[in-house]
Amino acid sequence: MGNLTHFDENGASRMVDVTEKPATERVAVAAGEITMRPQTLDRILRKGFEKGDVLEVARLAGIMAAKKVDGLIPLCHQINLTSVKLAFQPDEAHSRVVITAQVKCTAPTGVEMEALTAVSVAALTIYDMCKAMDREMVIGAVRLLEKSGGRSGHFVRDAQDRE
């Protein structure tokens, strides 16, 4: 594990200087889930909410959130993203929706925070749209699955930790 890069030698917060780093292709994949009552999941899948198609609204919210990370997380760089994709996998056996986000760019810094934020905001949007029916939903297991590009190389979460 390396040093914490967001602090200087005196412990003061700082934005990492990436001026001298080359722009390379960066990809990050994150996942998370929202667990709910079976009736809530069924209604989502039937597109039965008056507010609209819950998963499509969550997809748009996740994409928008990925594009605004530098305004949400204080020391994140402003990055020109080239792709943001969200996928939703309903899991009726566990009464949940698994959310996956893939974010790409060509930049001197990675897009892990953008992928994690996309997943988180998509889950929050599902919660918001369904809370009138189910206030016991649980958002969890938000994690980085994979990242590539840059100095730190290629990271892939162990298979047993991906679920």
Curated annotation (Swiss-Prot):
UniProt cross-references to InterPro entries, sorted A to Z: MoaC, MoaC_bact/euk, MoaC_sf, MoCo_biosynth_MoaA/MoaC, Mopterin_CF_biosynth-C_dom
Pfam families for the chain: MoaC
UniProt entry keywords in alphabetical sequence: Lyase, Molybdenum cofactor biosynthesis
Residues that hold substrate according to the record: 75-77, 113-114
Gene Ontology biological process terms, A to Z: Mo-molybdopterin cofactor biosynthetic process
This protein's pathway: Cofactor biosynthesis; molybdopterin biosynthesis
SUPFAM superfamilies referenced in this protein's UniProt entry, alphabetically: Molybdenum cofactor biosynthesis protein C, MoaC
EC number, as in UniProt: 4.6.1.17
GO MF annotations, alphabetized: cyclic pyranopterin monophosphate synthase activity
Recorded superkingdom: Bacteria
Catalytic residues (UniProt): 128
Enzyme class: lyase
Catalyzed reaction equations: (8S)-3',8-cyclo-7,8-dihydroguanosine 5'-triphosphate = cyclic pyranopterin phosphate + diphosphate
Family: Belongs to the MoaC family.
Function: Catalyzes the conversion of (8S)-3',8-cyclo-7,8-dihydroguanosine 5'-triphosphate to cyclic pyranopterin monophosphate (cPMP).
Subunit text: Homohexamer; trimer of dimers.
Designated name of the protein: Cyclic pyranopterin monophosphate synthase
